[in-house]
């Protein structure tokens, strides 16, 4: 490698947490995924906060929260402001994931980490790409190109290929799946041969995966036994990723008459179920060849489900007849409708709970997977209830004070606007106050008259101030006021009101009432719940198994391998296997959390800063696509560089934690003090944190002219004799090969010695010097 390649792990190494890594390619820094775990760990945010000012671009691989969950917080709260790249489905389905996650949390707790506006602001920054679309970066990223390739795990899931100057090839491939499924094709990593660096995960490195046919039979058997026993089936799934595979599978089973499931109900329950299905209908071209052919030949959209009912709340689900199979989010059972249904159904032995996803350790779903024999567990019951009594009165009083304060602020703003427009108002003659009719078109002031010297027998206008409301308009006409077009809400019938008050439908389950416009509070209590329902884990994660991962890496033959996201024993197993396959041809790294891996293969590559005075004195020679120059200078290690572009003298960085730091006497001039203040204003008063993030880059200064040593000329870009022959012929010099020697005008011989150098022989004549000059022109001489 001729580039500096470094990877800093912010989260998701030696564990199964969210994925977030900082990749440095020379001066450009990529953030590979921006995930957040189910518990919204602060450690991930703290790690991200230290590097957020360095990030130049974000690459998102999958739409689920483990890959992009922290993006709204990073954009809304940390100030992340850079280009974000993702495929079109990751953009659309990622929004669905985050909307559903926010609403699931908000329904039962006071969730304030991010809002729906933060989600929209973050996704507005995403540049949407198609598979195999090459994007050439600009600015600091000049010479870099990124290409998204299909990963086969979720719709739009991406393997990122990063290429530097057409030579260095970096592949970021996590959570990929090489097997073809109902709704997705598998990935084809074998096409990426001999990348310079491969970054992959070890999540499934030691996992033995049952065959797909066996898993489908297990699912069908479980569903049939439960439904025929008059029980309900809860399948915990994600919002808009792997749920599409299960929805396709179950809808196909329901269509099969032999299965006998047509009499039972099938439902999809999450906060955005309708939008997920609608987006899926418009993204068939991103799916498997089988679904594409079905859509093209039969003109039948595969996501036009016949048996799957779409539900947005427990009230919708209550209208679906029992027994039923429900696909509910979230897969971790930490929040959402899946948790609500689990609490309701787990104490009935007739029911069945099917888990399809190994979530992060510490979640309820992972606890049930790892401890299948546990029948009693403590669960925190959270819900949102209406305010009543004294709490409601206090809330109303607070809201009243807020409205009064807002009204006063609005009045003060209007007063400022009126005073600024007073000069404009005085120029216009007041119209009658009774004339307030609005027109469909912009009308000139009707009835307005200009005052004149002569008395007019017309109706006089009021003499007291009667300002008319100024109609605001832009280049499109009058500005529309939304309140003028609001439709009055239809009054609910007495029957509907009674249903809402009772909160029951068909005598089954309590309806979830819309509490968005009602003052509420969140309450929680921890209870011990006995699990009597059957709990089963069936793998529908859509990842490659351990043996396949090892074979794929062996076929790719990467020069360097960085293993992330997986338990330590799985990472160790994958590393040993790859070393056994590749031997000395592969370097394997298993970084720890917050560790920086230097994947630069060339050990003698360093970054230096050149003074302007030195650059202006250089004499460049062109060699192919590059320009070369000889430099005589001296290194100065006193200057520290921070990626914001603000430079500090080394002596000004006071870090008490580093006792061994070299003490350098820095000039205490006013400019240095100003620079230090600028750094504090950018990063706050935490000087220790600043010192940790400061990277020392030496500065190369020019030598005084009398100290510059001489050097022998260096000849670079050595030509081939056949090419030099063509140059001589173009200049009118006869040249031909005789025994491997190029003879020119029968007077000068050009030969290549055993050491590979080119020698010139012949009598000292005009042709000799002319041929020598032409030969020199073929070199870059510095």
Curated annotation (Swiss-Prot):
Single GO cellular component term: glutamatergic synapse
Start-end of Acidic residues biased regions: 417-430
SMART domains, sorted: Beta-Casp
Basic and acidic residues composition-biased segments: 407-416, 439-449
Compartment(s): Nucleus
Stretches the record annotates as Disordered: 407-449
GO molecular function per UniProt: RNA binding
Function: Component of the cleavage and polyadenylation specificity factor (CPSF) complex that play a key role in pre-mRNA 3'-end formation, recognizing the AAUAAA signal sequence and interacting with poly(A) polymerase and other factors to bring about cleavage and poly(A) addition. Involved in the histone 3' end pre-mRNA processing.
Family: Belongs to the metallo-beta-lactamase superfamily. RNA-metabolizing metallo-beta-lactamase-like family. CPSF2/YSH1 subfamily.
Protein name listed in UniProt: Cleavage and polyadenylation specificity factor subunit 2
The species this protein was found in: Mus musculus (Mouse)
Gene: Cpsf2
